[in-house]
Curated annotation (Swiss-Prot):
Taxonomic source organism: Mycolicibacterium gilvum (strain PYR-GCK)
Subcellular location: Cytoplasm
Binding of Mg(2+), residues: 80, 82, 84
Family classification: Belongs to the PRA-CH family.
Cofactor note: Binds 1 Mg(2+) ion per subunit.
Enzyme category, top tier: hydrolase
Keywords: Amino-acid biosynthesis, Cytoplasm, Histidine biosynthesis, Hydrolase, Magnesium, Metal-binding, Zinc
Keyword Amino-acid biosynthesis: yes
Sites where the protein binds Zn(2+): 81, 97, 104
Originating gene: hisI
EC number: 3.5.4.19
Reactions it catalyzes: 1-(5-phospho-beta-D-ribosyl)-5'-AMP + H2O = 1-(5-phospho-beta-D-ribosyl)-5-[(5-phospho-beta-D-ribosylamino)methylideneamino]imidazole-4-carboxamide
Protein name: Phosphoribosyl-AMP cyclohydrolase
Length: 115
């Protein structure tokens, strides 16, 4: 799988060839997680609708839920105005966080919402 050249030309990557992926749940609008992608991970995601990311620690792609069963079916993908971040809107099965939580942002509330 290779990324469409017109999409690749619009992406701004860091020195390691990666860009940020923000993941939002389709039904609730919750932000579930933030991950990294490379061109191949985005190409695979666009082709299969299975959320695929790049692990900086392992130096390889990983498909969300391949081992845990906590999958993300990708409903849509958008590129931000700067070209350095994509937004994946997904249908989440199970927890999105590696801790098992629904969202990676469930654990620490630093500022309570205003009343």
């Amino acid at each position: 799988m290779s990324l469409d050249p017109t999409i690749a030309a619009r992406l701004k990557r860091n020195a390691d060839g990666l860009f940020t992926a923000v993941v939002q749940e389709r039904g609730s609008g919750d932000v579930l997680m933030v991950a990294w992608m490379d061109d191949d991970a985005l190409a695979r995601t666009l082709e299969t609708r299975e959320a695929t990311y790049f692990s900086r620690s392992r130096g390889e792609q990983w498909i969300k839920g391949r081992t845990s069963g906590h999958t993300q079916h990708v409903h849509s993908v958008r590129l931000d105005c700067d070209g350095d971040t994509v937004l994946l809107v997904v249908d989440q099965v199970g927890g999105a966080c590696h801790t098992g939580d629904h969202s990676c942002f469930d654990a620490d509330l630093l500022l309570d919402p205003e009343a």
